[in-house]
Amino acid sequence: MMKFQDFSSGLYVAAKFSDSTLDEIENLQRELKVPNPVPRHKIHSTICYSRVNVPYVVSTGSFEVANSGELQVWDTQDGRTLVLVLDSDYLKFRHNYARALGATHDFDDYSPHITLSYNVGPAQFSGIVQVPVILDREYKEPLKINWTEDLK
């Protein structure tokens, strides 16, 4: 049973991907000559970034969660971020599961994605990419508000 103080720490949940998916993502980063690529060991998809902790149970199993994505550049407070937006009913379902438990979300909607670079500068990217995205596992940890410090 969760105690009151457990709810104040926040919750972060993410999906990690199979080695074959990581190989595909790294190949994509190289082919596109992505500036400042996210390193292999940090490639993930955020499922839940909640300012309150909830009793989320991570999923187990390895299976395809998407087979394509759309390249988009998002303007963020940290710069121009290149993402591969995934059409994944599974990741949306897991996000909605967290929300049903009471998790918060800072944006109007949830767009499952894999960040390819947190800083692409003026470079432009767009298009649909065929890539099998295979879940390896989910993990959860206390929310780190200053997570961008880990990127340095």
Curated annotation (Swiss-Prot):
Coiled-coil regions listed: none
Catalytic-site annotation from UniProt: 44, 46, 113, 115
Gene Ontology BP terms: symbiont-mediated suppression of host innate immune response
Reactions that this protein is recorded to catalyse: 3',3'-cUAMP + H2O = U[3'-5']pAp[3'] + H(+); 3',3',3'-c-tri-AMP + H2O = A[3'-5']pA[3'-5']pAp[3'] + H(+); 3',3',3'-cAAG + H2O = G[3'-5']pA[3'-5']pAp[3'] + H(+); 3',3',3'-cAAG + H2O = A[3'-5']pG[3'-5']pAp[3'] + H(+)
Binding site for 3',3'-cGAMP: 12, 141, 147
Pfam families, per database record: Acb1 (PF23474)
InterPro entries for the chain: Acb1-like_C (IPR056175)
One Gene Ontology molecular-function label: hydrolase activity
Taxonomy, superkingdom: Viruses
Keywords linked to the UniProt accession: Host-virus interaction, Hydrolase, Inhibition of host innate immune response by virus, Viral immunoevasion
Binding site for 3',3'-cUAMP: 12, 141, 147
Function recorded in the entry: Counteracts the host CBASS antiviral defense system. Phosphodiesterase that enables metal-independent hydrolysis of the host cyclic di- and trinucleotide CBASS signals such as 3'3'-cGAMP, 3'3'cUA, and 3'3'3'-cAAA. Does not cleave cGG or cA4. Besides evasion of the CBASS system, might also enable evasion of the type III CRISPR systems that use cA3 signals.
Family recorded in the similarity comment: Belongs to the anti-CBASS protein Acb1 family.
Official protein name in the record: Anti-CBASS protein Acb1
Organism encoding this protein: Salmonella phage S16 (Salmonella phage vB_SenM-S16)
Top-level taxonomy: Viruses, Duplodnaviria, Heunggongvirae, Uroviricota, Caudoviricetes
